[in-house]
Amino acid sequence: MGRGVSAGGGQSSLGYLFGSGEAPKLAAVNKTPAETESSAHAPPTQAAAANAVDSIKQVPAGLNSNSANNYMRAEGQNTGNFITDRPSTKVHSAPGGGSSLDYLFGGGSN
């Protein structure tokens, strides 16, 4: 197959970007009268179960729905509420003091 030769694959879905000149074709669904009758009398049990799941999916990943600490922080990309609930590795001491590595370097003893 040469360069610029189509291998088939059907119509491009990028027509909305490049202006295909054609409106997208809608698929027509034909129902028989028996299908429409049975669907009109079907109990709405699946719809009720789907609504309960949808309310859970409304909370973004990594955020606990019961946490009140869901605000954006301007400290960097690795701050905020994590999915893993691991403790932070951020250094919490001022430069030059309060190091937890004194046991390695012999500091802290006068």
Curated annotation (Swiss-Prot):
PANTHER family: PROTEIN SPIRAL1-LIKE 2, SPR1
Tissue localization of expression: Ubiquitous.
Family to which this protein belongs: Belongs to the SPIRAL1 family.
Top-level taxon of origin: Eukaryota
Biased composition (Polar residues): 63-82
Reported function: Acts redundantly with SPR1 in maintaining the cortical microtubules organization essential for anisotropic cell growth.
Coiled-coil annotated spans: none
Biased composition (Low complexity): 40-52
PTM annotation (Phosphoserine): residues: 67
InterPro entries with a match to the protein in the record: SPR1/2/3/4/5
A GO BP entry: cortical microtubule organization
Annotated Gly residues bias: 95-110
Protein name listed in UniProt: Protein SPIRAL1-like 2
Organism: Arabidopsis thaliana
Ranges where the record places region Disordered: 28-110
Keywords linked to the UniProt accession: Microtubule, Phosphoprotein
GO cellular component, one term: microtubule
